[in-house]
Every structure is written in C-alpha cells, then in structure tokens.
Amino acid sequence: MVKESAEILSEIRKNYILTTMKGGKRIDGRLPDEFREITIIENYVPRANGSAYVALGKTRVVAGVKIEAGEPFPDTPDQGVLTTNVELLPIAFPSFEAGPPNDLAIEVSRVVDRGIRESKMISPDKLVIEQGKKVWIVFLDINVLDYDGNLIDACTIAAVSALRNAIVPASREGGEDFKLPVVNTPISVTMVKIGDTLVCDPSLEEDQICGGRITVTTTEDGHIRAMQKGEIGVFTLDDVKKAIKMSLKVGKNIREKYFR
C-alpha cells in the first residue's frame, strides 16, 4: 500500500523478507495467517456517541461516531443514513499531508463502508424518526494516528468497535436514548502476496514489496460481504480461494477473541 510514497526497501532487505518467507515464517516471526497484537479501547472519546481506539501492531487509529437527526435519501425514505470518512493525519506517516483525502484515504473509506453496509451491520429501518422526513444519520469518522501497514483492517476493527458501543441520542427528539441497533460483526482480513505465499495483516515492509493485495470482509454466518483487490499484481483462482478460506478462519478468530 502507498508504495509510491513509502520508504523504498533496499534489495538486500527485500531478498531477506522473501527468503524468510520461503521458510514458512515472516520477518517478525508470525505465521502467514497470523495477525499482529490487537488492542481495543472502547469509548475512547467521551464526548462522541460511540468511539474506539485500535492498535494493530504499530498501526494506530481512532474511530468516532456522531449521530444526528436529518433528512433521509430520496430513494430510501424508510432508512437511516451511514457516512464513513477516513483521515490520514500528517503525524501518522512522512508522506501523509493535510488537505483533501488522497487515493489511499478514499480507498480505505470505501472498503470499510462497504463491509459495514453490505453486511447490514446496522438495522437502517430502526433509525427512522418520521418516515420520509426525518431519520438518524450516523457519521463514522476514523483518524489514522500511526501507520505501519494494514490500514483497512485496523480501520474496520475500530469502526465496528465504535458502532457496537454507540448510543443514539433520541432524547434530543423527545424519545429515550438507545443503543445503535447492531445486527452482526463484519471483519475484514487483508492479505498480500509475498512471492507465492499469501499472508494476512501485512506490515509496512510487507506492503511495500507485495505482489498484490486482496481484502475479504465476512460475517459470523460465514457469508462474504465485500472484496477488494489493490496494488499491482495477479491473483490466480486458487489464490482467491485461499484468501477466502483464510479470511473466514481469521475473521472468526478475531470475533471470538475481541467481540464476544
């Protein structure tokens, strides 16, 4: 990811990573299907309607939820609205700059949003205040504090965590506050191709030398909710099948460990 702006690895370092991978291990000692350590702190931003801090290895992000009443979209008058935004703070990585979102921020926003939306994580019909006139709009903002690889999965985990503890401020509209109606837990698993091997949760160095990236978002019922291919590279049909199998296994493990 962001190869054009990342620090260029020396050929010696690249060869070391590839040689180590041939032995079945990664340079940090992980197995191909092993995530880095995950830390989740819920309600990290007290004034938000929902929030979470997530550290995935040295990649750190904060997701915040703000819920306000507003008009529904004309084509979905009986549904609430979700809008997702990812901001790459300049402090997170040398090439990140202030200003309009770049291609990476846009891609991460879309992949996170698609996984949540297509999984039907939130029950949109339960966010209606007055059909056709007023609904709850869920603003999901994710700030990247430190980038060391695999933004998509870090942002997805933070987004899901923040939404799961979000409170709808219905008292502002004369009702009673209630928990955001969450139906399931979508988890994205991002994999890259190192040589001929698929590895999940790529570090920054693995991202820089990969031969393609693929993200698969699944839910606890075993359904695939979203897929995204990134970076330059080719995935065979067998690669895609392996990626799906790995995403189902790893996604299940993450849900069981962090989202009971």
Curated annotation (Swiss-Prot):
Gene3D superfamilies: GHMP Kinase, N-terminal domain. Keywords: Cytoplasm, Exosome. Signal peptide: none annotated. The keyword Cytoplasm applies. Coiled coil: none annotated. GO terms for cellular component: cytoplasmic exosome (RNase complex). GO terms for molecular function: mRNA 3'-UTR AU-rich region binding. GO terms for biological process: rRNA catabolic process. Its main location: cytoplasm. It holds the Pfam family RNase_PH. It is found in: Cytoplasm. Belongs to the RNase PH family. Rrp42 subfamily. Component of the archaeal exosome complex. Forms a hexameric ring-like arrangement composed of 3 Rrp41-Rrp42 heterodimers. The hexameric ring associates with a trimer of Rrp4 and/or Csl4 subunits. Non-catalytic component of the exosome, which is a complex involved in RNA degradation. Contributes to the structuring of the Rrp41 active site. This is Exosome complex component Rrp42. It comes from Thermoplasma volcanium (strain ATCC 51530 / DSM 4299 / JCM 9571 / NBRC 15438 / GSS1).
